[in-house]
Structures are given as structure tokens and as C-alpha cells.
A protein has these predicted regions:
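A mature extracytoplasmic/lumenal domain signature
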Residues: 35, 55, 61-65, 76-80, ...
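Beta-strand-rich interaction surfaces with strong enrichment in secreted/lumenal proteins
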Residues: 46-49, 80-84, 93-94
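Residues that flank catalytic or metal-binding motifs in active/ligand-binding sites
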Residues: 47, 55, 70, 89, ...
Length: 122
């Protein structure tokens, strides 16, 4: 029990005195987004991406719909991000989330399809 208390006290001290990330180095986030078929609809999973303002975002896009040879689009118009993803040919998009808000993720090839949302927190 004393060992556990000592370890917890040590962790508390480390946490209390740990400083923030060095100034000038933006946070980064990398995530894989996969296009799948679910109940007859093609969707990007995960459908919601949440980051803090100022984060450098890298998204690897994979079209994983085996029954559909078509291309699928991935676009975040609020950030001028767009890619066309063929099955078996992953694409990568990068941008800095420099505006707070909620931004729709759409398929620019099929405008009626909304694929999710990018949530950028202050």
C-alpha cells in the first residue's frame, strides 16, 4: 500500500510540474478514415473528427467498399480540402485546423452525400 501511495505521489508531482508543449510547435493529429458500406449506404468512418484549433491534421483516406468499383470523394469545403479515393489507392490530405467551428465532410462527387463533420474546438 505504501508503494502505491508513493507511486501516486510521484506521479502527482510530475503532473504538477510538467509544462505545456514547447511554444511554436503545433499539435498534430493523424487518423485513418475508411469508406465502408453500411445498410446500402457508403459512409466514411469515423464520421466525426474532433481537433483543437491550431492542430496540424493528417488524414489517410481508404476506400474499402469491395462491391463498388467507383471513386469516392472526401471534401471539407470550409478548409478547401478535397480528395478522390479509388479502391485500393489510399490518399492523404493535410491541413491546419485554423478556424473553430463545425465543418461538413461531403462527397464532392455526389453532393447530396454528407459524410460527417470536422469539429474544431477553440
Amino acid at each position: 500500500m505504501r508503494t502505491l501511495v508513493g507511486v501516486l505521489a510521484g506521479l502527482a508531482c510530475l503532473t504538477a510540474f510538467a509544462g505545456p508543449a514547447p511554444a511554436g510547435e503545433p499539435a498534430t493529429m493523424s487518423q485513418t478514415i475508411v469508406n465502408v458500406e453500411y445498410e446500402g449506404s457508403k459512409i466514411w468512418v469515423p464520421g466525426t473528427i474532433v481537433v483543437k484549433k491550431g492542430t496540424k491534421v493528417t488524414l489517410k483516406l481508404i476506400n474499402n467498399v469491395p462491391s463498388d468499383p467507383n471513386q469516392h470523394g472526401f471534401a471539407i469545403p470550409g478548409y478547401n480540402v478535397a480528395a478522390i479515393v479509388n479502391r485500393g489507392e489510399p490518399q492523404t490530405v493535410e491541413f491546419t485546423a485554423d478556424k473553430a467551428g463545425i465543418f461538413p465532410i461531403i462527397c464532392q462527387l455526389h453532393p447530396a452525400h454528407v459524410g460527417g463533420e470536422l469539429v474544431v474546438l477553440e
